[in-house]
Amino acid sequence: MLMLVFRLGDNRYAIATPAIVTVLPRVNLQSLPGSSPAVAGVFRYQGQVVPVLDLNQLLRGAASSALLSTRIVLVNQGAPDEPTRLLGLLAEQATETLESHQVEEIAERVDFCQSPYLSEMLVSQQDIIQQLQIYSLLSQQAYDELIAQAATVS
C-alpha cells in the first residue's frame, strides 16, 4: 500500500493513499469564528464546502507554517459504507510517498498518547513514522456542525 508521508516538527506521519482524494497546494481558507483552534477553516472544492483541520495544531498545539511544501490533503473521511465526507488536512512537508514494503510495522503498539486518530507505528530506514487514522479525526456530528457553521458565514 502506498502512503503519503508528511512531517510535523521532527516527527513523520503517514496517511494511507486509498482515503486520499487529491493533494492541493495551500489555499486561502475562510475562518470559522468560535471553532476549535485545530479547525483551520473551510474552502470550496468542486462546489462543496470542505472543512480543513490543521494537523500541526491538532497534534502539536501550534499552527502549521506557511511553507511551500504545506499542502491540503483532501481525504474521504466517510467509512466505506457511509456517504462521502470530504475533509481537508493541512500538513507540512507533504511531498513524499512510501510503499508499505519499505517499512516494518512495530508489533506492539506503543500508546504514549490517548489520540484515537493515531494508529500503527512504522519503522523505515530513516526513522519511525506514525500512521494517521483519518476515520477517527472528526465525528459525523462535528463534521455536520462545521458545515452548518460554514453556511452561516458564507
Named regions from a protein language model:
Residues M1-S154:
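An acidic, low-aromatic, low-complexity terminal/linker signal
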